[in-house]
Amino acid sequence: MELIFERSRPGRGTDLLPPLDVPACPVPEEFARKKAPRLPEIGESDLSRHYQTLARRAFGVCDGFYPLGSCTMKYNPKLGEDMAALPGFTGIHPLQPGHTVKGCQLAMAQTEYALARITGMDRVTLQPAAGAHGEFTGLLLIKAYHRHRGNNARTVILVPDSAHGTNPASAAMAGFTVRNIPSNADGLVDLEALRAACGPDTAGLMLTNPNTVGLFERDILEITKIVHEAGGLVYYDGANLNAIMGVARPGDMGFDVCHLNLHKTFATPHGGGGPGSGPVGCKDFLAPFMPGSALCGNGGEHSIGQVRAFHANFLVVIRALAYLMRLGNARVAEAAQGAVLNANYLKRKLEEAGYTAAFPGLCMHEFVLTLEGLKKETGVSALDVAKAMLDDGIHPPTMYFPLIVHEALMFEPTETEAPETLDQAAAVLADILRRAKEDPESLHAAPHSTVVGRPDETAAARHPVVRYSFPEG
């Protein structure tokens, strides 16, 4: 397929702008480009067809089953889009006088209040723009707390070996040293290893609950107690809140600070690079260090300061608020229960088909299969199975993560999938398992029906080409 630049022809454009009806405001010459930008020149019909073709090649939750583990690819109600498109929200400017945007301030305050209730936290800020940004903000709160108390030696953040990769990255960015905590044979935090790792240098522990293999940390009260007795704080990574929202609260488990992913748990479209939203909640004793909120205004003298310009990715907040108001308190819990039910249903179907779960028994909202045995028996890898799913119109699950499981495939079906969809997916995967044993070569070559097959991902990562180079230089 040609790139948009390759379809460009000199003089063929869509410059049908009306005459200027306001005073011209030219860019000062010292800031102006020396050469005109080399934008593609293309007619409107060709432009439309180009992007329609690209759209047909894309795959989203409205196109089919999308069980991408740890990403919560649930259906996003169109009500949120309608609310986010209201002129009173889209036509504002962050520098407007406060008295002209009272409705927007109220919407943010209502969202903060709702998120505080769901998480069991006392304060919430909407400033962080995404999940990892929320992690970074929460870690800065922990750092500021210890510095304020004169505990400058607390420089270590404990991170389980099953954690999301952003956890150690965020801790390092915040200036901490990362210490790894191994999982036990059941896929849970090893309590003895945690006790041994805690000490006078412990600033805190980052933990997801349910964890990244889809299991609830049944010793969570003991875990938070161990860290607190060592003088550290406990951070809740809200990546998996969809499994427990409305049912259990991180604040009641002993967590001191948390972030949420509005673009996952609260039904805002995601997966295309943004925008996201990663609000941070905390207990009262950390509130003096917060960057500010719609409910409580700007931060005080001990605040870590603003972590982004203005208030939030505002329209993501509006979508999340619409989702919460549409569900109401009771149905928020129903959504979480539906996510857990669907995950266990699909897990059982796949086990009956012959797949091996990394951890037997009930799971929460997601589960991990290990294809290590299948690869030894047939040579068919997790990558082969994932690629074969594309031929049947199913987006692959997360591959080779978490790292503690060999040949891992992580499924998260979410609450918005019907049983018939799960049955169909199970049937597809059962057929792939049959082919792995009868005709493994067909899987090594999969996918067979997609425009893009198996790109060289290693070369793409090491030598990325992210801009167009004109043939003439």
Identify what each model region corresponds to:
Residues 1-123, 248, 300, 307, ...:
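Non-catalytic terminal extensions of PLP-dependent enzymes
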Residues 69, 127, 160, 208-216, ...:
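Glycine- and other small-residue-rich loops at beta-strand/loop junctions that grip anionic moieties
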Residues 72, 130, 163, 211, ...:
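Short, flexible loop/turn elements at secondary-structure junctions
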Residues 275-347:
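Mobile "lid/hinge" segments at catalytic clefts and subdomain interfaces of large enzymes
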